Amino acid sequence: VIRSMRVHGKGSSKYDNVRLGMNSRLDTIQAAVLQVKLQAFKEYELEKVNEVAARYTEKLADCVKVPMVPEGYYSSWASYNILFQDEAQRDEVRAYLQENGIPTMIYYPKGLHQQKVFEHCDLYGEELPVTTSICKRTLAIPVSPYLKEEDQDKIIRLIREKTGANA
């Protein structure tokens, strides 16, 4: 099963994919770059991105639902997703951020139970109202160890303005 998964879910023949899989093998150059990048990640980026995320959490927790990492743990913060009251509020804030030059992403427009790759699963097509609601209310905002404090201040200010938290 592991061998199959590491080659895109390959079955007994080359084009017979029997499960979800991936190809995560690195060539020598990719491995060399990654070795240097991992050192920078350990020495600087992990701590710094957690500081950026903690600042978002502190400044936004009273106006949107923010992600929580248990005490004593770190996250690599591939994304920082905030949860709004409803889809309309999310879309309004997203448009406002984009008008002000702030990129955003909706990484989860629909739940896994709604994605074709899982149509063979028992939950495919089922109504999962909590999952569906979260997908409609979630927005990823910029997070990076290199995000400047003044840029983060602007993002925070714009979100607070549009959610009415500054009133």
Task: State what each model feature region is.
Residues 1-167:
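PLP-dependent aminotransferase class I/II
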